[in-house]
């Protein structure tokens, strides 16, 4: 049953804002939608606490909660992905009880044992990133009054994890395999790896080297990255800076000529500029490659719906032609352009990023639930017959209608708000949060849904991914919380940079 509230374990105060003449469901909705800005951080904490309580009650110590069936699931090695992914958000929200629960859990993880094949990419961004971020946020900060010994365990566990993962780089090129059998220290034997799965390791592994004074971790990821920075053959770099999505592990050569900012490619480009934020002096080449990719994206992948020329999306390039489709996953791109524009003092990148933010906002604003779909298109030649009027009105049609609590649209709203100061983007974040809360809440958490363009989101599909804690709730909270070292600055040098799982990593001094 659809809940029209965001009442978590500590949000009874919200009901007091309701009009007594309205029924309970209505007044809870009004209370959430109409909260004053100063009350919004607590409402977001309440959402976190509601989901956390459900996880701890029904799923701990498994990876994730199924918030409809109230069961646990282990899609991420069975080490408790939700606690590790939630740690940095709990620190930022100032939730000491949750932080201490998570620190106790982490101390018990044995990373050498798992019954499942492991993704190097997912394990790096969620577990390794979560551990390093927790350490960066807590070490010598006095935050949460955390036990210093428990804080030190975070770095110890990060080293343990990297040590059981590093065999993945044992190829003739140093390009890692992604699918690993950790107990046997073997790979699945795949001959290729993806652009993002190779190119989204360098921040976490480099930071681990900096924290431990052991160069090997960063060198492993940076050696693999060199093949992405110097793509061969050049024919598979379809436009300057934009490369294909698959690379041969044994030869280091790209296997196809394509380009996109979608899943599978996305966070490679994201990390190019973020490594420059991490250390401008050491990663200038990464920045140069990002600039090439950004310029080529504007020139070759920018696209607008026929009837909505003021709407801007980024398409993909395949088989020598522009593909007019995109994904929720790709909607991080607006924030990445905004970050790059601010970092490089290149206002043309910031302006383009804001156009992308506006385009992705329209995928939310035009659906029944006010949540954007998993994937969408705008090719006037491929409009589904049952979406003709929707396409005319909105400028896009829905290819995949589900929503799995993804953060990317809110993430880009956050960057837009922090860099411009325009409260419009803050309002858009709150609108999205209200819509997600209204549509996805269950008695024990928040659930993925089947159809963003159907009443009540269609059906609840029983997944609460760990990134809902790490990313979706964090970016929402940050937009309404006070200035802090981990916030993106409007200008100047950031003290932290977010990994692709929204874990704040302290930049080099």
Curated annotation (Swiss-Prot):
Q: Which InterPro entries match?
A: 6hp_glycosidase-like_sf, Glyco_hydro_47, Glycosyl_Hydrolase_47, Seven-hairpin_glycosidases
Per UniProt, the cofactor note for this protein states: Ca(2+). Can also use Mg(2+), but with lower efficiency.
Please list the disulfide bridges: 331-360
Q: Which UniProt keywords apply?
A: Disulfide bond, Glycoprotein, Glycosidase, Hydrolase, Metal-binding, Secreted, Signal
Q: Which EC numbers does the record give?
A: 3.2.1.113
Cofactors (names): Ca(2+); Mg(2+)
**Record's SUPFAM superfamilies?**
Seven-hairpin glycosidases
Where is carbohydrate linked to this protein?
170, 399
Q: Name one GO cellular component term.
A: extracellular region
Q: Name one GO biological process term.
A: carbohydrate metabolic process
Signal peptide residue numbers: 1-18
Annotated metabolic or biological route of this protein? Protein modification; protein glycosylation
Q: Which GO terms describe its molecular function?
A: calcium ion binding; mannosyl-oligosaccharide 1,2-alpha-mannosidase activity
Q: Does Transcription show up as a keyword for this record?
A: no
Q: Would you identify the family this protein belongs to, as annotated?
A: Belongs to the glycosyl hydrolase 47 family.
Q: What does this protein do?
A: Involved in the maturation of Asn-linked oligosaccharides. Progressively trim alpha-1,2-linked mannose residues from Man(9)GlcNAc(2) to produce Man(5)GlcNAc(2).
Protein name as catalogued: Probable mannosyl-oligosaccharide alpha-1,2-mannosidase ARB_00035
